Amino acid sequence: MSLFHLIAPSGYCIKQHAALRGIQRLTDAGHQVNNVEVIARRCERFAGTETERLEDLNSLARLTTPNTIVLAVRGGYGASRLLADIDWQALVARQQYDPLLICGHSDFTAIQCGLLAQGNVITFSGPMLVANFGADELNTFTEHHFWLALRNETFTIEWQGEGPTCRAEGTLWGGNLAMLISLIGTPWMPKIENGILVLEDINEHPFRVERMLLQLYHAGILPRQKAIILGSFSGSTPNDYDAGYNLESVYAFLRSRLSIPLITGLDFGHEQRTVTLPLGAHAILTNTREGTQLTISGHPVLKM
């Protein structure tokens, strides 16, 4: 079984019962869960003071336990406050041997992008303690794809995507759209050329999703990729004023501007049903009438 080390660099864990349920679910499955005290920390809306949350991250460089999964408790907001003070060099150096398998999403995207930008460190965009492992019921699709990514040096995700017939190969990167936008022009924005960019978000109206995608487009980031994959955009509900404008309108507009394939429909993001993606790994994307495949390799895995 595996060792989970919890970190809480973002928002306060308001759903304490869900966090405890997640810990219990993992221990019942035979796993060991360390650093559980972070779930109770609070300072204003954050999961502790800046010093405490920063230490969650910087202390990873001193973590010597082998075969360790570092799991973010939740997202929210707070990671952006820490970026300038993270010891990136120490974390990058730590990942050169027996790398920690670092997993999270949402606000945690800022940390993941920083690690990729500062030292090509691969992390996993996937489930977190509260929202996923601590849900009323752990989604079997999510659980399967989590272990699929962490246990296999090469694995393939399949879905029925929407978009043109294509084949693209490159570095898989991305995560939460709003967090990526917040990093443009900073040292923590990865400079990936000819990559496969995967994006998701939550509670953003379709026009806000479009505006953020256009910012990536106008900044030259989208045109420099081989392909774009869009996951779930939970809570992106149009209203009467939109008069038919919706996410499909956004996708159509972007496709009219881009010369690279934009593939939608991947179960990836804030929904209970989500895949786990190693950001920074090598990926091959194929989309045909029969379906879509994403084959991923080159990421760290658990040693069985």
UniProtKB/Swiss-Prot annotation:
It is found in: Cytoplasm. Pathway: Cell wall biogenesis; peptidoglycan recycling. The active site is at 106 (nucleophile), 200 (charge relay system), 270 (charge relay system). GO terms for cellular component: cytoplasm. It comes from the Bacteria. One of its GO terms (biological process) is cell wall organization. InterPro entries: Carboxypeptidase_A_C_sf, Class_I_gatase-like, LdcA_N, Peptidase_S66_N, Peptidase_S66C, S66_fam. It holds the Pfam family Peptidase_S66C. GO terms for molecular function: muramoyltetrapeptide carboxypeptidase activity; serine-type peptidase activity. It catalyses: N-acetyl-D-glucosaminyl-N-acetylmuramoyl-L-alanyl-meso-2,6-diaminoheptanedioyl-D-alanine + H2O = N-acetyl-D-glucosaminyl-N-acetylmuramoyl-L-alanyl-meso-2,6-diaminoheptanedioate + D-alanine. Its EC number is 3.4.17.13. Keywords: Carboxypeptidase, Cell shape, Cell wall biogenesis/degradation, Cytoplasm, Hydrolase, Peptidoglycan synthesis, Protease, Serine protease. Belongs to the peptidase S66 family. Releases the terminal D-alanine residue from the cytoplasmic tetrapeptide recycling product L-Ala-gamma-D-Glu-meso-Dap-D-Ala. Can also cleave D-Ala from murein derivatives containing the tetrapeptide, i.e. MurNAc-tetrapeptide, UDP-MurNAc-tetrapeptide, GlcNAc-MurNAc-tetrapeptide, and GlcNAc-anhMurNAc-tetrapeptide. Does not act on murein sacculi or cross-linked muropeptides. The tripeptides produced by the LcdA reaction can then be reused as peptidoglycan building blocks; LcdA is thereby involved in murein recycling. PANTHER family: MURAMOYLTETRAPEPTIDE CARBOXYPEPTIDASE, MUREIN TETRAPEPTIDE CARBOXYPEPTIDASE. This is Murein tetrapeptide carboxypeptidase. It comes from Escherichia coli O157:H7.
